[in-house]
Each structure stands twice: as C-alpha cells, then as structure tokens.
Amino acid sequence: MSEAHIYPVKQNIKAHTHADNDTYLAMYQQSIKDPEGFWSEHGKIVDWIKPFTKVKHTSFDPGHIDIRWFEDGTLNVSANCIDRHLATRGDQVAIIWEGDDPTQDKTLTYKQLHQEVCRFANALKEQGVRKGDVVCIYMPMVPEAAVAMLACTRIGAVHTIVFGGFSPEALAGRIIDSNAKLVITADEGVRGGRAVPLKKNVDEALCNPEVKNISKVMVLKRTGGNVAWHEHRDIWWHEATAKASDNCPPEEMKAEDPLFILYTSGSTGKPKGVLHTTGGYLVYATMTFKYVFDYQPNEVFWCTADVGWITGHSYLVYGPLANGAKTILFEGVPNYPTTARMSEVVDKHKVNILYTAPTAIRALMAKGDEAIKGTSRDSLRIMGSVGEPINPEAWEWYYRTIGNEKSPIVDTWWQTETGGILITPLPGATALKPGSATRPFFGVQPALVDNMGEIVEGATEGNLVLLDSWPGQMRTVYGDHDRFEQTYFSTFKGMYFTGDGARRDEDGYYWITGRVDDVLNVSGHRMGTAEIESALVAFNKIAEAAVVGVPHDIKGQAIYAYITLNDGVYPSAELHKEVKDWVRKEIGAIATPDVLHWTDALPKTRSGKIMRRILRKIATGDTSNLGDTSTLADPSVVDRLIAEKAQLK
C-alpha cells in the first residue's frame, strides 16, 4: 500500500465480522454489475407488508431526474424499528439516555418504547395529524425526541426536525417551507449546564405572519422552567399521552411515500428541504449500520450526533433500532462537566461502538490526557468519525488515546442528501490509512471528474461524483424538483455532483479534500455562505458582506466575513459584538463569524460578481499566487485587503 501509516485489519475483528475483504469485494462487484439482483436480495433486510417486485427505477438524465426504489412494496418504519423485535428482544434495552447532568440517566426497552410510541402516535392523531401531514420537531436530546420521530412514522406523518440550536427565525423559515401542521417541542432543553429556551423560540417563530398552518404545539416538560402558554394551541405532552391508548396499528406506507424532510444549507441562500422516502432510506440506513459498524447482538452503540442532523436520524435512531441495537442518546456535550465526559460515558455504559465528529476529537486532543482521565475505555471495539474529513493527526490521537490502539476507525463520508454512509472502511475488511475514507459501500459508484466533466482514472484528484443511484438517495428538494436537478445534476450531466473534491490514491482509496462550492463545514455542520451573508446584509449598518471558510484546528473550518459598512458607520469593538450577536440571533450560534474583516470595498468583476477565490486566498494568507486579477473592476482593492488582513489581530 502507498501511504506511510497502514493499519491492517485486526485478527480479532476479522474472526467475527459480517464482511471480510473477500466478502466485501464479491458483494461490491455484484452490487455494481447487478444492482437489481443485489438490492432485490438485500432489500429484505427490512420487513415488508407487501413485498416489492420492482427494485430500481432511476434516471440521472437531464430533464428526467427520477429516483425510485422498491416502489411497489409497502412497509412501516416504526414497525421495523420496534414491533419486529418484540417477540425476540422485547425486554432488551433499546434506548439508553444519558443526561447533561451525569447523575441523570434512564433506559427504555423495546417493549417500553413500543408503548410510548403508540401512546404518542395516538395523541398526535387526537390532534388531527393524518398520514402525509408534516410535523415539525424542535426538541432537546431526550428519549421523547426519538419517540416523536417513531410516532410520526407509525401513523405516516412526515417529520421535519429542526436542530435545537437554531434561532426562532431559522425555525420559522423551515416551518413555512415545509407547511408543517403541528410543532413538538419542550419547555427548555439542557446543554452544557445551560438551559435552552425551546418553547420561547417556538412562540417567537409562530409570531411570523407567514406561519399559517400550525394549529397545535405539543410541549414536553423537561426542566419545569416558566413558559408562556397559549390556551387553545399548547398541549402538555404528559397530559396528551396520559389518556391515550397504547395500541396503535402501524400505517401501511408505500416505499416512495415521504418519510422526512431535513433542511440543509445550500450555496444559494434559502435552506433546502431534503426529502427522503420510506423504503429505500430504511433499507440503506439498516444495511449501512450493520456492515459499517459491524454491529453484533447486544452491543452498545453511541452516536454522539444530535437528532436534528442526518447522522442522528440514520445512526442514532433508524439504523440502530431497525437492527435491534442498544443506542445511546446523549443530552450533553463531550467536555462537560469534565473534559473526560465522553470517555466517562463510554465506561459508564460499556460502549462498544463510538461514532463521533472530528470537531469533538480535535477539541479533546487539545486537552491531552485530561480527555481520558480516570477512564479505561476497555469496552470499545470499533470507533467512527463523521461530519467532515478527519486530519491524520486527529485520527492517530483518536486511535491511540481514546481507542487504546485496539479499535479500528471507520472514517465515514456521506451527506444529508445521501441518507447513509457512501465511502467508508468496513472493520473486518479494510486496511486503514489515517485521513482516508477508503472505499465505497455496496452499490455506490464514485468517480472523479475534471472541471469539464471528463472522468479521470487512476491515482488523481478531481470533483467527486456518483455515477448511479443507491436506495438511500434523496428524491427531491421538497416542493422544488427543479432546484434538485439544478443543484446536484446540472454541473456534470448524467452524474450526481457531491460538491466535494477528492483524491484517489494508487490503492483506489478516496481522500476527501473538502467542499468545492460555497458551502462551509463548521464543526461538522454544513452552512451556505449565502445564508450567512444574507443575515449580515440584513443588519442595518452593513452595506455588503462576503463569507469564506478558513481552516481551523478544532472546528475544521472557521467563518471569515469581509464586511463593508454603510456611509457614516465605522468599525468599533461595540459594532463587532453587535454584528456577531445579530448573526447568532438570525441563524444560530454555529453560524457566528470567527473573523470580521472590515473593509471599504470587495474585489468584484466588471459585471459585479465578487471574486471569492481571491477572498479565500487572502483569508488563508495564501497571497503568493492570486491568479488572474485582470477582470477586476478595481485591482487595487486586492492590495488594500492584504494590508488590512496583516493588521488583523
């Protein structure tokens, strides 16, 4: 193999694995040569009410983007995640909840989860929620968040989860776009010892005059904090479920019925509602969970993601539960109340598989041995990384320090849009290279293309595309199929463009090099530069703004904002704080710029287009080769920006 550090497959993993290297190669070849045959067989990993006979109907052709899988089959997601396990493991733990406060925890068995989900599903029906209605979930990381998701799927309602860190404005935008009928929230959330005012944010969001369809708000009592109450609109969760029956037959859903909408940032400002459907998504989440994490019966799996992100959907709730796993739902943050909290949780619950983000790993790495103080982490068998590419130094630290050099790391590459993991090692099959996502999962056909769309072979770099569909692929942008085609299929005709660049080495391993479009990846959260720019320009003292990402040791990317102010407004420490607070309010803390670079003018072409390529280079200090600046309306702007950058503290 080509790279300096190679970690061969561990013999103890290989001895009891779902797929060794020979199995991987044989299955992968079949999945590419005969996708119909492959998915016809592996589609049976979930239980169907009416078995499918049609497997794959997909087209990436311009003007005919159409993705359908298992389309004549019917099933229910909640029945696959709960009911099918009741006879064999009804008394086994399904969800382990670990509170923000280390003294708080609880478990739900599959039987208890079934009861809770049925009751809440009936409570939703009582409030008029019907099959096909959209329900917005804005919840803390408590078991009821998973219960709410599963209750929606039980009755055929479509959920759209909004991360609890988003502001009222961002929440309102998602409620409006999805046409949600009901909101599920809590009085407050708790995170890192602080209360998060969820109900207050919902109340503010619903004041937006464009929010027209919300008839009810279901409120979970999490902290008992004071909240405003709207008598005919708001309902306490505990009161609604107290009188609900715990018998709720699962709704029979078509494979292509919508399952959920999840908003993700685009480069054009307005967030995109990624639509996933029932059959293909569940097959893919179930299959990837089983093989990527090499899940064995009775193991404890901990995905540290929030349910508000796709990782929480696929690998905290649906993938684990469909496989009958024990899944941990963690309310807190990895370094509270102690730096070693993540390791403490691993020991406390004897976690076998840990799936976390490079951001968390880098933050803990900065603390050295404090991150593992007083812990052994002996239970760990497999570790994973998700959200952004992991740099080799962080990979090595994670492997050595957290994993005691005995747990292989699955460095997984995928997106909200893909529904599940696309490029990844398999623990019993793949020799590891720190920093490489390695090889494609079954049925996934990656390719690298140059900027003209020509496929480039061998060891090379290029734009990462996918040549054919897989069951977990998003079907459309909610309410805007043209935008779906425009965003993902117009750059390179007949291919799905991921928006990422990648390098392929001589062993065929993929190394993700990051976004090639104007989307930032901050702490594993994707945000469009346009969304942040829009928020900045909406501030009454700002004339213009341009946002770029710069490398950051902990977060992966930091947000660097170039700002021109209105006439008569001058930079000050006070304005600096005002601008940051404004973005926090408009979008959320995650979008707060790390650097504000005040300037008089931005580099623009004569047609008025901002030259972001130049801004990126200046922000990262890479000014030796700025490329062609002849198209700039005023080339002197560049020298001014470089001088200003040098003055920034």
UniProtKB/Swiss-Prot annotation:
Keywords: Acetylation, ATP-binding, Ligase, Magnesium, Metal-binding, Nucleotide-binding. GO terms for biological process: acetyl-CoA biosynthetic process; acetyl-CoA biosynthetic process from acetate. CoA binds at residues 191-194, 311, 335, 523, 584. Its cofactor is Mg(2+). ATP binds at residues 387-389, 411-416, 500, 515, 526. Gene3D superfamilies: 3.30.300.30, N-terminal domain of ligase-like. It is an enzyme of class 6 (ligase). It catalyses: acetate + ATP + CoA = acetyl-CoA + AMP + diphosphate. The keyword RNA-binding does not apply. Acetylated. Deacetylation by the SIR2-homolog deacetylase activates the enzyme. The modification N6-acetyllysine is found at residue 609. Pfam families: ACAS_N, AMP-binding, AMP-binding_C. It comes from the Bacteria. GO terms for molecular function: acetate-CoA ligase activity; AMP binding; ATP binding; metal ion binding. Its EC number is 6.2.1.1. Catalyzes the conversion of acetate into acetyl-CoA (AcCoA), an essential intermediate at the junction of anabolic and catabolic pathways. AcsA undergoes a two-step reaction. In the first half reaction, AcsA combines acetate with ATP to form acetyl-adenylate (AcAMP) intermediate. In the second half reaction, it can then transfer the acetyl group from AcAMP to the sulfhydryl group of CoA, forming the product AcCoA. This is Acetyl-coenzyme A synthetase. It comes from Vibrio cholerae serotype O1 (strain ATCC 39315 / El Tor Inaba N16961). The gene is acsA.
